[in-house]
């Protein structure tokens, strides 16, 4: 297969034509090849507009949904971002192409090691990966993040994650039941309260942890 062509078509038809217009996000999708993050036997489906299984009961998300979440985050070049749910590492790599530094947490050790190996193979130096309960946020040190992206469904906003946002920081998270959610964009206001905006409906795997399911 011509993966380069498939990648360009994905960006044009699945992202641009559905309202993803942030050039930083579109350029990241062109640089990061999705087929490198899926199982070999599923490579031919890598650029289809659908989630794919990656093992351990987890999936790599639909390209459009990832693009939408990244666009909602309003990412800037100097941002420091926390990702909850490394999974295959695909979204992590997209983030790493856009922002200065990405911290990412994965609860499954097998997926975490696989993603870490992939980051090293591809030469990423601005990704810090830890295994743990992502609902608690980054516990290794005190950091305030410009953005937080959560790649699993929560019943509500986990308080530890909101507390780790900078004033003016943004979080994008699917919130709802175990079977259907809506993307929420959470902004931390000057007074410490949250502004909530609603986006598309979606279906993510449950966010497992102390402040999740």
Curated annotation (Swiss-Prot):
The keyword S-adenosyl-L-methionine applies. Transmembrane segments: none annotated. InterPro entries: PCMT, SAM-dependent_MTases_sf. It holds the Pfam family PCMT. Its EC number is 2.1.1.77. Its main location: cytoplasm. GO terms for molecular function: protein-L-isoaspartate (D-aspartate) O-methyltransferase activity. It is found in: Cytoplasm. GO terms for biological process: methylation; protein modification process; protein repair. The keyword Repeat does not apply. SUPFAM superfamilies: S-adenosyl-L-methionine-dependent methyltransferases. GO terms for cellular component: cytoplasm. Keywords: Cytoplasm, Methyltransferase, S-adenosyl-L-methionine, Transferase. It catalyses: [protein]-L-isoaspartate + S-adenosyl-L-methionine = [protein]-L-isoaspartate alpha-methyl ester + S-adenosyl-L-homocysteine. The active site is at 61. Catalyzes the methyl esterification of L-isoaspartyl residues in peptides and proteins that result from spontaneous decomposition of normal L-aspartyl and L-asparaginyl residues. It plays a role in the repair and/or degradation of damaged proteins. Belongs to the methyltransferase superfamily. L-isoaspartyl/D-aspartyl protein methyltransferase family. This is Protein-L-isoaspartate O-methyltransferase. It comes from Petrotoga mobilis (strain DSM 10674 / SJ95). The gene is pcm.
């Amino acid at each position: 297969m011509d993966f380069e062509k498939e990648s360009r078509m994905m960006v044009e038809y699945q992202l641009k034509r559905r309202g993803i217009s942030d050039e930083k996000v579109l350029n990241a999708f062109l640089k990061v090849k999705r087929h490198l993050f899926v199982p070999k036997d599923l490579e031919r489906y890598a650029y289809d507009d659908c989630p794919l299984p990656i093992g351990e009961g987890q999936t790599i998300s639909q390209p459009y949904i990832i693009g939408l979440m990244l666009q909602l985050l309003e990412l800037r070049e100097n941002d420091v971002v926390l990702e909850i749910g490394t999974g295959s590492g695909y979204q992590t790599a997209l983030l790493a192409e856009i922002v200065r530094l990405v911290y990412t947490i994965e609860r499954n050790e097998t997926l975490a090691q696989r993603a870490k190996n992939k980051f090293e193979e591809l030469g990423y130096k601005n990704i810090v990966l830890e295994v743990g309960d992502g609902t608690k946020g980054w516990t290794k040190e005190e950091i305030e993040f410009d953005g937080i992206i959560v790649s699993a469904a929560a019943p509500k906003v986990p308080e530890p994650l909101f507390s780790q946002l900078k004033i003016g920081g943004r979080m994008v998270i699917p919130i709802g039941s175990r079977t259907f959610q809506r993307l929420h964009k959470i902004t931390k206001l000057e007074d410490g309260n949250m502004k909530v905006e609603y986006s598309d409906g979606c279906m993510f795997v449950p966010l497992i942890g102390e402040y999740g399911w």
